[in-house]
Structure formats: C-alpha cells, structure tokens
C-alpha cells in the first residue's frame, strides 16, 4: 500500500460522506427544477412511459416526501440496534390513500426539504458503531446503514429523471 492509497475504512467513510452530500444536492436539484412549474402543470402532465396511469410531477414529489420519512424511520430503527425487520409499504396505495395529486406542491416540496435536512443531520451524527447497524429490508434482505444512505440519493435520482421526463413531454 502506498501513502496515496486509502484504507478500506477510509474509502468506506468517503463513500458515506459523498452519499450524504448527494442527499443534500438532489433536493436542491428538485427545487431548481420545480421553481417554475405551475400547479396546473404539476397536476396534469403524466409520466409518458406509463400512459394514463402514469404519475404526475406532484404525485412523484409526494412519493419522494413520504419515502424520505419512511427511509428515515427505517434508519432510526437500525441505529437503535438489534437488526430490526424494516417495514414495507405499498407506494401505489399511499398515493391513493393520501390523495397525492390534490396536495399543494409548494407545501409538499417544503416538507421534503425540511425532512431531508433532518435526515442529513441524522447521518452526519451517526457514531462509527451506528454506521455498522443493519436491518432486514422487506425486499432486499440484509440492509446496512451505508445501504440506507445510498438508497436515498439513488431513489431521488430515479424520480428526478422521471420528473424531467414528465416535464419534457409538455
């Protein structure tokens, strides 16, 4: 190993730091994308890849807000210890039950920004022992705290692409 080579632990810490930074940036990207999207556009244009059943920009934004909270609660459960079984959720049912497309886009985005700041603070405050925490994900099995940090930004990117595709269809 040369002096320019990072240890495995240092590399892992760098990956974690970068994913937490990505969590901050993806919300800022959403704010920029949505800054000039009016309510009518946010609630009428649908994902062209899914036809009439495709989600609107507002529905995608509500999904991001709700899953930010879900991901946060799962990470909290893991940090508390004991390799918990993490709860699963039906995202389509949530969209219907919570009437996503009837919500206020500005309020939804503000709630996501607030939730994300709390989530970033959570990750930045984790101890080395808490970073080692695991849970059992309902779809993926064994799930690490690093997986949890990576999931947030990757989930955001998936849906940012979806939102830009919806808006580009206008």
Protein language model annotation of sequence segments:
Residues 1-29:
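Extreme N-terminal tail/first-helix region
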Residues 2, 6, 46-94, 120, ...:
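Short, contiguous alpha-helical
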Residues 11-21, 43-49, 81, 102-103, ...:
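Solvent-exposed interaction patches of small proteins and small membrane subunits
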Residues 13-24, 54-61, 105-109, 146-149:
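Amphipathic, non-membrane alpha-helical segments in soluble helical-bundle scaffolds
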Residues 22-26, 31-35, 95-132, 152:
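Acidic/histidine-rich alpha-helical segments that form the ligand environment
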